[in-house]
Amino acid sequence: MLVSTIGYQISQNSDFDELKKLLLNHTKRAYLVGGSVRDAILGIGSKDYDIEIYDITPDKFDALMQECGAVGVGKSYFVYKLKNYDLSLPRTESKSGYGHKGFSVEYCNDERIASARRDFTINSIMVNIFSGEVLDFWGGVSDLMAKRLRVTNPKTFSDDSLRVLRGVQFAARFDLVCNSDSLKIMQKIDISDLSANRIYLELEKFFIAKFKRRAMELLSELGLDLKLFGVEFDERFIQQISNKIHTHKASFLYHLINYYAIDGKSLISRLALPNCYSISYKQPFLRRVSKFELLKIALDMPLYQWLGLDSKARIKMAKDLGIYDCKFSPHIDTASIKTTGKAYGDELKRLKIEAIKDYLNDCN
């Protein structure tokens, strides 16, 4: 679809009618910006919009926002939240201290200059919500169409090291390859200043993304596979991950931990990941499966919850056995077990194994 058509569709989107009425007497230069435009071009639906508003002073903007009941999310950054809009004034940012808060922010009423602060060109495209005019000062549209990840401003990109990990998750989500000049810039950036939480928030997007190969290749080129996960990704592992069906955000770590025989508990702790990721080292791992082994796992969980159910063949086997959506729950006469303690547990386990064998014999 032509980008001009996207611009027209955005200008006609009824989601912006209320906002246009609010801004009409103040400006005709209000732009949909950032990921909202990128996603629109890619045909990805969104109900949350980032709007950048020009031709209004910070004082008048603050007054207007308070009048309409918008909630400020950082006055020094001129950003307000109104329903599903993030409304902001155009700005420039310059590094003035350490960490992600060490920035000086200045109001800027020039679209080209303001858009230069965007991390990658694919996020620098702007669409006027009144006219549908598309502003693409940095070639973001052509980069998006070519599936190319390219830094917008080489001079300021390194001001925030988080941009490196943002690049990784963009590669994973949108099937992008980093161009050579941008790669060289990113390779020089140390991410040691980032908190564990900021790193996790970007990694999580990678964990659930479709094109993991792109991100893994980029992580490897940046040396971040070793820094973050303690191993260097080899082509066999990258290919293996590419071929797997991933249904849970812990799937990548599950395969990483078992492929490289990593201490999963230590890795999860070092990355400060939430407890939900502990299943990546707690769940059983099988290189080859049989009906018997699947039924054993299904004693504890329906198999759709098992991270090892990662291929069409395994999914089909689970469904054929009737254990995809529900656990395998054979009738066990526990009253017949006359022992206690560990002996009781051992006998119960033996009876369950016998029940699995009986079930398979009946199936045959």
Segments the model singles out, each with a brief description of its role:
Residues 1-364:
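Catalytic cores of the polymerase beta-like nucleotidyltransferase superfamily
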